[in-house]
Amino acid sequence: ILKYNKQNDIKILDYGSGYQPRVVFIVYEILVKKYRKKVSFDCYDFYSNNDIKNLNKQKKNKIKFYHLDTIKKIKKRKYNFCLINDVIHHIGIEKENFIINILNDLTRVSEIVFIKDHFQQGFISNNIIRFMDFLGNYFNDVNTPDNYYDKKTFKNLLGKMRVIVLEKILSIKLYPPFLLFMSNPDFNFVYLIKKRK
């Protein structure tokens, strides 16, 4: 975020924030406390009105929560960044046109979209990631998909959009070694994209 934005005020959209938006809270705390930035987050998910009310109590005016459908009402670019963290595979990678429409909406309202998701390399790695996903979402009402992207299918997806890839990291170490096969950094990737003019 700091690499691509030198402004003091930063507006961030988080797509698919979930009910325990830890990533949002961590990013907010780092940018505000360590880097002294003025940060506002708008978090979107399939929240009920009651969920929105309860979540909005947590951080007062700095982090706001909204129902996903309201993104369509945003008419012009409003955000410096969009985070879409471990969300796309839950939509279902076979729903390619739907995912393209979502990413087009996000690149329309955000200068830069930060995508973090999972890569599989075959049957075994796909099922390891499914197991990890099941454990990670056990207490949430989130489906575990059957399939995850591989490098080729994700590259093909982006190739069908009018976007520029600013940066990509195809292997990220996120988990400690004692998790053995689940700590494989090749299971996680990041892409930063922006709309091509």
Regions found by a protein language model. Give the residues of each.
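A conserved beta-strand element that flanks and buttresses the S-adenosyl-L-methionine
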Residues: L83
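Short catalytic micro-motifs in class I SAM-dependent methyltransferases
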Residues: D86-H90
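A short, conserved alpha-helix within the catalytic core of class I
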Residues: I91-D105
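Class I (Rossmann-like) S-adenosyl-L-methionine-dependent methyltransferase catalytic domain
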Residues: I1-N5, D9-K62, H67-K73, N97, ...
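Alpha-helical scaffold elements within enzyme catalytic domains, especially in hydrolases
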Residues: D105-L106, L157
